[in-house]
């Protein structure tokens, strides 16, 4: 099914998983990743709306789960980033733990978009997030954000290495795509994956 992401609008912000809308109604895809990995920017690029989600240059600023509605019953979930270094270990892991709870409990979740800075790939909490998703058969699409920050040659080599490392690490194929809001890498692939999941 082809969705019109241009008309996506803000729905609600909630502080916890139990505050999310009734899971028996509709379908959703979640955007997750480390603080400042580009989740909000990816949603803005997907929807061609520069101000749909607030993009903060200060990591760890967002502390609410933001929901956006593509069409009635079709939602995108923007989770706060995990692993912000200036927080205590408990706080650094807090949103990762919330995401794992969400993965286990949310029956209408159709897939996970994992934003990963291509310059710092497959960090500890990213690995644990993928493992949690795979354990409950939730598909993962990894976007290598900030791909415009490195040269095209390094981008190709790094992307291949990440794909290889993830296949060895998880013993299965994880979809991986370079992504850049600036150079428009990966936006069409993101739409294709979302349309496939949300049908």
Curated annotation (Swiss-Prot):
Full protein name: Probable GTP-binding protein EngB
UniProt cross-references to NCBIfam families, sorted A to Z: GTPase_YsxC
Alphabetical UniProt keywords: Cell cycle, Cell division, GTP-binding, Magnesium, Metal-binding, Nucleotide-binding, Septation
SUPFAM superfamilies reported for this sequence: P-loop containing nucleoside triphosphate hydrolases
Family indicated by similarity: Belongs to the TRAFAC class TrmE-Era-EngA-EngB-Septin-like GTPase superfamily. EngB GTPase family.
Gene3D superfamilies: P-loop containing nucleotide triphosphate hydrolases (3.40.50.300)
MF term (GO), any: metal ion binding
Binding site for Mg(2+): 40, 62
PROSITE patterns hit by this protein: G_ENGB
Function according to Swiss-Prot or TrEMBL: Necessary for normal cell division and for the maintenance of normal septation.
Recorded GO CC terms: cytosol
Entry's Gene Ontology BP terms: division septum assembly
Chain's gene name: engB
Record-linked HAMAP family: GTPase_EngB
Required co-factors: Mg(2+)
Stretches assigned to the EngB-type G domain: 25-199
Entry keyword Magnesium: yes
């Amino acid at each position: 099914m082809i969705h019109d992401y241009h008309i996506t609008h803000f729905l609600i912000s909630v502080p916890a998983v139990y505050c999310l809308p009734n899971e028996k109604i509709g379908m959703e895809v979640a955007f997750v990743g480390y603080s400042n990995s580009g989740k909000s920017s990816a949603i803005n690029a997907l929807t061609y709306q520069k101000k749909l989600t607030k993009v903060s240059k200060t990591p760890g600023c967002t502390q609410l789960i933001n929901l956006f509605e593509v069409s009635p019953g079709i939602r995108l979930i923007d989770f706060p980033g995990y692993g912000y270094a200036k927080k205590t270990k408990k706080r650094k892991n807090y949103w990762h733990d919330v995401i794992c709870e969400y993965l286990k409990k949310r029956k209408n979740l159709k897939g996970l978009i994992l934003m990963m800075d291509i310059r710092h790939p497959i960090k500890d909490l990213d690995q644990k997030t993928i493992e949690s998703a795979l354990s409950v058969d939730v598909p993962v699409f990894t976007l290598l954000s900030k791909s415009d920050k490195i040269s095209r040659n390094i981008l190709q080599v790094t992307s291949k290495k990440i794909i290889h490392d993830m296949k060895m690490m998880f013993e299965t194929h994880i979809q991986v795509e370079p992504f850049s809001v600036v150079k428009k890498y990966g936006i069409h692939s993101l739409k294709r994956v979302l349309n496939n999941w949300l049908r």
